[in-house]
Amino acid sequence: MATCTLRGLAVAGGGESSESEDDGWEIGYLDRAVQKLKGPLLPEEKNETFKKALTTGDISLVQELLDSGISVESSFRYGWTPLMYAASVSNVELVRVLLDRGANASFDKDKQTILITACSARGSEEQILKCVELLLSRNADPNVACRRLMTPIMYAARDGHPQVVALLVAHGAEVNSQDENGYTALTWAARQGHKNVVLKLLELGANKMLQTKDGKTPSEIAKRNKHLEIFNFLSLTLNPLEGKLQQLTKEETICKLLTTDSDKENDHLFSSYTAFGDLEIFLHGLGLEHMTDLLKERDITLRHLLTMRKDEFTKNGITSRDQQKILAALKELEVEEIKFGELPEVAKLEISGDEFLNFLLKLNKQCGHLITAVQNIITELPVNSHKIVLEWASPRNFTSVCEELVSNVEDLSKEVCKLKDLIQKLQNERENDPTHIPLMEEVSTWNSKILKRTAIAVCGVGLLLFVCKLTLQRK
């Protein structure tokens, strides 16, 4: 019966070019085509046999060849060593044997380290984790970067391995180091949509405000790549998760972070992520994950939670400490109201023109902010309802509020027009008053322009809200 062979090429890990880093190794799981050594081999034959033993994972033959005198640091095509190859295919036993025979865990080829190769290997996280742990136990440096300034933790985060990330940090990996483009491990995880890695990095002290070279934060990178759940989570102002595990010792961290569920199949460990709703994201951001089941059992939505009174918190079994966290978050989310009490009392005769002009300028600026806010909402609002990630209330509620907004803006527009007409009337009367000393022309023109701009801005707000209303009605 013919031997079935699966072949591929082992390439440099971690995003390095396969054209420049191809080591020419054929990999795959082959039937044991290589038998025990039957006699002395020429050096060329011995190297080829060693290479085949490595590709087939024949541990006993590898050991026999090493016993025969072949170097554990043999350099194959493009400078790869046996240990680098073993790490690239996550062969834990082979990595262990080679390390026990004296292989250098800190070897690198053109700044491509064995640890980077292990972190970017194609395999289950369980196998990658074990290989990385072996390399770290032999003093492999977790902060040595490749040519692109990417460190092992960035590769682990990019490929979605939260436990590998945790292990690297426990051994001293810098969680906030940046590559040549300014990407951190958190940025890579957000870019690739790995929610569990994002959460783990925040626990380990990742700074979510570090920007890339083009000025983007991890949340903006997540948004650009359509990972809206991660974007919403990273956009939360309050984040008690940050640095949660930084004060633990290495042993405590490893014990806490490397606990696995034995009931899960090895090939599917850590590979599936729980989808977060708006309630879960809010609670996780406050470190209140333990409340999730309680609130769901009582059918409490995020909207309901955010509008609860103190007696309702207690009635639903929410402790005082948890209440304080929720109320603190609500305080951060409050929108600063315009302090109309500070506006000038224009009825007083001693009010100066400068103060009144300042009032109009502030009002115009507020209108501009409102226009920008509505424009941003219209831009970001999904065109199709199936693209909405988080739970939304009935669109009728939004439409109703938009209708009230349009009505209020229309009323505001009418009042501003009345104000403009009144000021124009006062100006005309003063110009016709023979005892009045005319103001400078440019000042008059400037005041007129301000009033016109204010009126246009208010009308613009009304138009934008009307468009927003139509958009929501289509949904």
From Swiss-Prot:
Superkingdom of origin: Eukaryota
PROSITE patterns xrefs: ANK_REP_REGION (PS50297), ANK_REPEAT (PS50088)
Cellular component, GO annotation: pi-body
Domain SAM: 272-334
Subcellular locations according to the entry: Cytoplasm
Protein's GO biological process: cell differentiation; male meiotic nuclear division; regulatory ncRNA-mediated gene silencing; spermatogenesis; transposable element silencing
Keyword vocabulary terms for this entry: ANK repeat, Cytoplasm, Developmental protein, Differentiation, Meiosis, Phosphoprotein, Repeat, RNA-mediated gene silencing, Spermatogenesis
Keyword hit for Transferase: no
Main location as per UniProt: cytoplasm
SMART domains documented for this protein: ANK (SM00248)
ANK repeat locations: 45-74, 78-107, 110-144, 148-177, 181-210, 214-243
Positions of modified residues (Phosphoserine): S17, S18, S20
Purpose: Plays a central role during spermatogenesis by repressing transposable elements and preventing their mobilization, which is essential for the germline integrity. Acts via the piRNA metabolic process, which mediates the repression of transposable elements during meiosis by forming complexes composed of piRNAs and Piwi proteins and governs the methylation and subsequent repression of transposons. Its association with pi-bodies suggests a participation in the primary piRNAs metabolic process.
Oligomeric form and interacting partners: Interacts with DDX4, PIWIL1, RANBP9 and TDRD1.
Protein name: Ankyrin repeat, SAM and basic leucine zipper domain-containing protein 1
Lineage: Eukaryota, Metazoa, Chordata, Craniata, Vertebrata
